Design a protein with these regions (language model features):
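C-terminal hydrophobic helical "lid"/dimerization subdomain
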Residues: 1, 281-332
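Glycine-rich beta-strand-centered segment in the early N-terminal region that forms part
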Residues: 21-39, 51-93, 122-124
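Residue-level marker of beta-strand positions
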Residues: 68-70, 85-86, 110, 155, ...
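Mid-domain Rossmann-like dinucleotide-binding core that forms the NAD(H)/NADP(H) cofactor-binding site
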Residues: 86, 130-207
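NAD(P)H dinucleotide-binding glycine-rich loop of Rossmann-like/cofactor-binding domains
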Residues: 90-160
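Glycine-rich cofactor phosphate-binding loops and adjacent beta1-alpha1 units
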Residues: 191, 196-270
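Rossmann-fold dehydrogenase core element
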Residues: 246-251, 260-300
Length: 332
């Protein structure tokens, strides 16, 4: 098979499309023919550049944490999947490892993954769409409902309305019966939140975020603040917008990561701040069901051949606003 591998940290040019041995399924694994895998700012671009050493990745390495495709081989102990099944791989692995981090990922024509990390994908959901959902859906679900304990009738502020974690969060929260306030750094990006079903949208480049939230909520504030950016100018305003006993959840910090926090607000308001970038495969199931029923849409910038991965890494480094990029090894 061919795979995109890097043998040293560095610029996008360290990525090489090379022949590697075909993977063989272990007893609890499956081998997947990859049809889609995404390019992530941290889990791909930063790791390849060597600017995310805390993940512990050492070259040589094949990136790609969220492939989707078709099962072509199953291990002897695998009973939940069969050859021909359409699947997506979620990052969490049995024993606490992370697919694409502690093992080779899916930037390849074939990949091996634990069967327990795979989720079946219904025919109504395309592979590119499935890859975005497998990467961001379980994390969004975990943040909103497992950590954030969001309930129908509560109000949630979601930053990054046009991003994938934000856009999926908006749709999941709205489907659960919450009042959703979407916020972004431009009018166009905030409008995406409204288009996805948010009750209110705020362009925080034009207004003070806290003032806008207090106007919308008649001074009450929000029950839950969902932020995966950590913008040091905006995140504190979100925290200040929480009502007493409010909760903040996060799984990202590419806009920071250091944010000034008024701890007097935290303890006087008895706030809870929680972070967790991980999730479980079962958290993907309601997301895939919603997508198959037409109730969850994802934002995809482009789908290109896997061979173009170096150019896509360079594009993502040069343009912080570029959307989700999907690599498809069946295109070349």
């Amino acid at each position: 098979m061919k795979a995109m591998i890097f043998n040293e940290f560095g610029p996008p040019g360290v990525l090489h499309y090379e022949e590697l041995p075909d993977p063989v399924a272990g007893p609890d694994d499956v081998v997947i023919e990859v049809h889609a895998v995404s390019v992530n700012r941290v889990l791909d671009v930063a790791i390849r550049a060597g600017t995310a050493p805390h993940y512990g990745v050492a070259p040589p390495h094949v990136l790609g944490v969220d492939p989707s495709g078709v099962v072509v081989e199953t291990g002897g102990n695998v009973s939940n999947l069969s050859v021909g099944d359409r699947v997506s791989v979620t990052m969490g692995m049995p024993g606490g490892g992370r697919y694409g981090i502690e093992c080779f990922g899916g930037d390849s024509q074939l990949t091996r993954a634990p069967a327990a990390s795979c989720v079946k994908v219904r025919d109504e959901v395309g592979f590119a769409e499935a890859t975005v959902i497998s990467r961001h859906g379980p994390v969004a679900y975990n943040l909103l409902f497992n950590l954030g304990e969001l309930k129908a009738g509560q109000t949630v502020l979601i930053l990054g309305a046009a991003g994938n974690l934000g856009s999926i969060g908006i749709q999941l929260a709205k489907a659960a019966g919450a009042t959703v306030i979407a916020a972004a750094g431009s009018a166009a990006r905030a409008a995406i939140g409204t288009a996805l079903g948010a009750d209110h949208a705020v362009d925080y480049s034009a207004v003070n975020l806290k003032d806008a939230i207090m106007d919308i909520t008649d001074g009450d504030g929000v029950d839950l603040f969902y932020d995966n950016i950590a913008n040091p100018d905006i995140c504190p305003l979100g925290i200040e917008s929480l009502k007493r006993f409010g909760r903040m959840v996060t799984a990202g910090a590419h806009g920071g990561p250091v944010v000034p926090v008024n701890f007097a607000t935290v303890y006087h308001q008895q706030l809870t701040i929680m972070g967790n970038p991980r999730s479980k495969a079962q958290d993907a199931l309601p997301c895939f069901d919603a997508a198959a029923e037409g109730n969850l849409k994802v934002v995809i910038d482009r789908v290109v051949p896997l061979a173009e991965a170096p150019a896509m890494h360079a594009l993502m480094e040069a343009d912080p606003a570029v959307g989700k990029i999907i690599l498809d090894s069946t295109l070349g």
